From Swiss-Prot:
Protein name, per record: Ribonuclease HII
Organism in which the protein naturally occurs: Shouchella clausii (strain KSM-K16)
Pfam families, per database record: RNase_HII
A GO term, aspect molecular function: RNA binding
Broad EC category: hydrolase
């Protein structure tokens, strides 16, 4: 009888054969059946991730079949916060790109986003990140600022793109484009841009927390949490706050940080 420790090793390293799996199903030892159950659950999860990856790659593949060469995903983060920039990323992935589990950055943990961002940046054909400041958001409004950040990111690419995949927006640029509702959960290129933009902006807000202690920018990234609203009432607005966003003026009562 094969020791349970040996079975565990074979299951973990993937060296077990179909015949061996069939034999394990007949093994009545509780430890073996528990190992087998976990293994099967992992295999099912892996297959789910593979299918999701294929599904999220279909837009890029269809565009390549139509003759487009450099399909670029574009996404933004930071439209809703009361402070900080709106940040966009444009990303072109290679044809053989594979990163199982990649999806909308909002669905990933901070640790996963950091891990994936490193892998994406290493594998990408090209990517570019751009931001528009809170002051400029106040001048031109958040929608126009978002589009400007996206356009800046596209223009910053080291390789020219011939088709854009966008998340529920259209840009006034002379490039063919496809807009997808909830695109960051439907396209790998958009998801990759979502992750890169999110990680970059979060790091920016963490640095901002050192400049303006007491606001908690490193925890809420500028969103209107209860603690952030309280900080506005206590300390007032910083230059990084969006004065055109009603809660900023209402909660700060016009108080300026440091005065």
């Amino acid at each position: 009888m094969v020791p349970i420790a040996a079975i565990r090793r074979k299951l973990m390293d993937g060296s077990i054969s179909h015949n061996e799996l069939d034999e394990l199903k007949k093994d009545q030892r509780k430890g073996v059946q528990e190992l087998l159950k976990r293994y099967q659950a992992q295999q099912e999860k892996q297959q789910t991730l593979i299918q999701m990856h294929k599904q999220m790659w279909r837009y890029e593949q269809e565009l390549k079949q139509r003759g487009y060469v450099a399909v670029c995903g574009v996404d933004e983060v930071g439209r809703g916060p009361l402070a900080g920039p709106v940040t966009a990323c444009a990303c072109i992935l290679p044809d053989d790109f594979q990163l199982l589990g990649l999806t909308d950055s909002k669905k990933l943990s901070k640790a996963k986003r950091e891990e994936y961002a490193k892998m994406i940046s290493e594998q990408a054909v090209a990517y570019s990140i751009a931001s528009v400041s809170a002051a400029e958001i106040d001048e031109i409004n958040i929608l126009q600022a978002t589009k400007k950040a996206m356009t800046k990111a596209i223009n910053g690419l080291s390789q020219k793109t011939d088709h854009l995949l966008l998340d529920a927006v259209r840009l006034d640029v002379p490039i063919a484009q496809t807009s997808l509702i909830k695109g960051d959960a439907k396209s790998l290129s958009i998801a990759a841009s979502s992750v890169l933009a999110k990680v970059w902006r979060d790091r920016y807000m963490e640095e901002l927390a050192q400049t303006y202690p007491g606001y908690g920018f490193d925890t809420h990234a500028g969103y209107g949490t209860a603690s952030h609203l309280q900080a506005l009432r206590t300390y007032g607005m910083t230059p990084e706050h969006r004065k055109s966003f009603r809660p900023v003026l209402e909660e700060s009562q016009g108080l300026i940080y440091g005065t």
